[in-house]
């Protein structure tokens, strides 16, 4: 019986295979029950990330399950303190990481029904963390980005709950976490998980709407995502979406659009794409779309049309947000790694995962937008065999089964084409579409046809009728850009007629006829050919068959930027007199000339009678090219010549040749003369380049080479003489009109010239236009005469005009003829011409410009037969390979020209006397050429009309912006004098308004805040600016001295008794300018500072500052010497005595060579920037920025040291007080609104935009102590804008007692600072500690108030700085000690840190406080009803922790602990567990009673893992 029972009790025997299977099943079941974070199938292994997280959780699982919140916090802090005390940072970081991961894992696995437990874990983690949850948020972001779709339902819900908690606590990483999780709301996905996540996020945003409104960068991202989700939810299948949720989404988006439209504009053109789609689906968005088109200004003040948004490219992160991280990774893998031809299987995998359902087709437009605008392949990918972007887009379009989504996908593809601007948009955004059309022509012609039909039939015709022209222009720009950049070589194969069909191809030709060429380089030449064909089709005007369109020469680069000056009335009258003399001379020559010799027979058909010239003239206009749009003009439209400008209008010849001009030819178009030389450079040719040669003696090789060049460069042009290109009426304007052919003669508008004689015929075989210049006479060749003498007209040289005869004489092989000029101008002495044989021809190897060679004076030639013409002639016969002359050296610009006496008017042909032997004729000729070229550069911005009323206070040259730096001071002085003597108020107001308008235009570049053009900080503080003239005229030096003296007298008082007066007329101008440019406010502030005693000194010229003699590094002296030497206008000099002498000498040179120095004045800002960039430091490795900062700081310190307690901002304060209507009222309390303080803050914001605010803070606090000390708004501005370097500088100045920040308002400022960001609180407390070091006891006095307002979780920086303050103070008393001990458990670390410090460093004082508490406890019988009992327990508790932490150190414990008193307290207690609770303390004071306590509880042991009572943290830290 016993054996049978034993056999029944034995387990059944199993085979090894069965045991192995059982073990595997148990392990799998264990993992399935333990690892619940990610979704796993039965065959899947546990995720390595979850395994590691689970191990971290297991280490604190027992603590989390068996302890209260306070016990968890105490254990973690004690454990963290013990790890940190070991000195091993790696171990400390590992412990922090493991605890953080454990809490995150515990929260993720928490049940949504037990939110309290998750909240407790999150609160404990917040209390424990030492990096403000930075590690926690980084782990959470990585989890969401990589594995969110693998999470189970409960962790997914907990992730949303964690984000909600981060938003509730206003954590700094909540925006990034929110943006990442929004990417996991899939488009075209109607699963329950996806819809639930969408609704949860929407409810979260609705709950925290105030937080969302404070996040302007997050609002557009959320709006774009939910607009895209509404697009799916509207077209949802029946029953897959809750209508209530859809209504909430619509209302949420509409609310954001109506209230935060300005923030949403950053989305750009894709916002309009979504709104246009939704307007056709819902009534709400339809009404919004109507309001957006009819009343756009109601949405945003500066928003006038949706075209603004359509011209704004959508930033990449918006388009990226609609693809999940996993989807984006797979798309990028195909575009970066898969070779062309192998992409089919990858496409199939992608379709299987993301594009299975019909609803998922809405993802295709998002993917196309991502491919076009987000991913731009680098060059090595473009050059490889990787699958191109256009192939993937073509596959996506083929995948669209629905016509609606297919059309919407094509709109996504061409969205960037509609308003394409090359300067704003990227060509990579439009490249896939054009390559898709070009690459699909051969194999997939239907794709190309479909896309072309979409462009022509939908986008250009019916997409937006109201903005049809703008869309056509944008598509035109797109095609022009892809052709220009060489994306495709031609559009002929993109629009094949055979594939498109007749009707579609006709539409294409209608819209894109100008692009249907073999190469975009020949577009302009094709226009010329079409123009010639039109001329051939006009039988009534046969003379126009060979007449080409006259093109403007390509803009030549001037040698310098010297600007021509206006002619005075006296000079204009002299010019008119010379013009009359010219006409008389021409008439006399016409009467003396013989009949012209008939040309050879083969040239007769090319001659044209002069009576047909008026019909030819309209054909000479150059076709206009719109640079901004890239459009060529309609060649069928006649070109109308603009009327000539008046002689008083200041026009530069290069105004039409500026790169921004709208009538420039393209870069590929060049205008050649008969020799094949680009006429853009004719003005630089030397006298030996072109020789005068009759037509009959020209070599055949010259003619053939010319034709070959023309055939290569451009279509054949009809050869036209210069005379035939003149105006029919022969009224020759003095200046070139911007959109007119070159003016070939010079005359005055007031002098009517006679028409040319009927026998004036000039052949046009080998003549071509040579130069385009204003007020120039160009002579034409006479091919019928064997030799001739060019008769130059009189030269009228005025400040605004230059004569061209010298240049034309240089183009001849003859020396130039003498010209007449005004006696007030510099004339050019030219020797008489000498006839030379016509066989002179210069080869291509000949030098073009030889200024060293001086032509010898020649005798007057014999009279010869001239062709009867009203214009002198010139023969041009040079080889077609003439190189361009080299640029002239700057030293050639300073050649002095001595004006000779004018020749008698009665003998116009009499040669002038020979020049003096010392005069360099060639240099004079060269100088004339230089002056001509230097006068043809004039910016469009300075061509302004000066009102006549302003000419009463200055001349036109003085009002030129290039001279305004020097002349504005005298202009303002004349203005003040004029106003004071003008009794008529109306005239005063008119003069003031005119001067204000002028100054607002001239000073716009200087006063308009633009980070791209704003001068550097060093220039702002150390260089003279034009606006300083106005400041000096408004605040006179006398007023400044009165202000300084008054302020010094009143330095002991808190308010200024008197304020300086200002010049009222100038103040009115300054006030109006301040309304336009608010930056004037802080510029007055800076000017008042740097011009105070100890600052910059003004030089004698009134437009230059001298840097004070400040002791600094030698490196700055050397660099500044070079800087001041190179800068004649705005330099800052380091050595005042030597540099001031140099400055005075430069001023003398400036008065002598005023015209040459105008160019320097035109580049004041450039010189300032160059001067700063030229600062070098060879002795130390200091960057230029650091040197600039050092220089500014030394200057400001010099000003403060030199002024003491004087208010150096009196002018600035007076300016704002006058703006407010008078003297400033007494300052209100600092926290009350003050208009002057508001103005100061506004100006400081403007100063912060250029980086100057930080330097002004100490002076502002010192000068406006009664206004700014204790002001929270100004302090917040300082803290939010300050950088660490300036903060350190300000704290040093506060600690030295130079100024105060808090004053008597410390409590209110601290109270408000609790709402600020953590770094702002940290900066504030460092400034408060600095001020407390001067005014001792500030913080200690308000310690109870501060500690009562503190939140240890949100104000950890404040707690840290408060700890530093209490450690350093010598004024802590018994009240502070007792209040610190009575703080709650959340301040455990703070209390223990202070208790340990006081006990070790202030042993005697702390020891007395503790004994005092113990004595009171022992003497009080009713000790259970007062706070003394709690104080005793805290002291015992911290004594015990102190002994445990520092037990191994050699400390004389008798000086810190009174064993008798402690033992009495322990014995008197009725708690039986007291000795076990304070075992470390009990073993020290009661060794006999602690014998039963285990040895490992000795205070010398630092580890407590082996302690029985430490095994349960809940029991260990339980409070009585």
UniProtKB/Swiss-Prot annotation:
Keywords: Cytoplasm, Nucleus. Component of the integrator complex, a multiprotein complex that terminates RNA polymerase II (Pol II) transcription in the promoter-proximal region of genes. Component of the SOSS complex, a multiprotein complex that functions downstream of the MRN complex to promote DNA repair and G2/M checkpoint. The SOSS complex associates with single-stranded DNA at DNA lesions and influences diverse endpoints in the cellular DNA damage response including cell-cycle checkpoint activation, recombinational repair and maintenance of genomic stability. The SOSS complex is required for efficient homologous recombination-dependent repair of double-strand breaks (DSBs) and ATM-dependent signaling pathways. This is Integrator complex subunit 3 homolog. One of its GO terms (cellular component) is integrator complex. Residues 626-639, 736-752, 819-828, 1489-1504 have a biased composition (Polar residues). Residues 527-549, 557-595, 613-625, 642-669, 694-717, 725-735, 768-789, 837-882, 1116-1130, 1137-1177 have a biased composition (Low complexity). The keyword Transport does not apply. Belongs to the Integrator subunit 3 family. It is found in: Nucleus; Cytoplasm. It comes from Dictyostelium discoideum (Social amoeba). Pfam families: HEAT_Ints3_C (PF24566), Ints3_N (PF10189). One of its GO terms (biological process) is RNA polymerase II transcription initiation surveillance. Residues 1-23, 523-671, 689-801, 813-922, 1116-1177, 1489-1520 are annotated as: Disordered. The keyword Ribosomal protein does not apply. Component of the Integrator complex. The core complex associates with protein phosphatase 2A subunits, to form the Integrator-PP2A (INTAC) complex. Component of the SOSS complex. Residues 596-612, 898-918 have a biased composition (Pro residues). Its main location: nucleus.
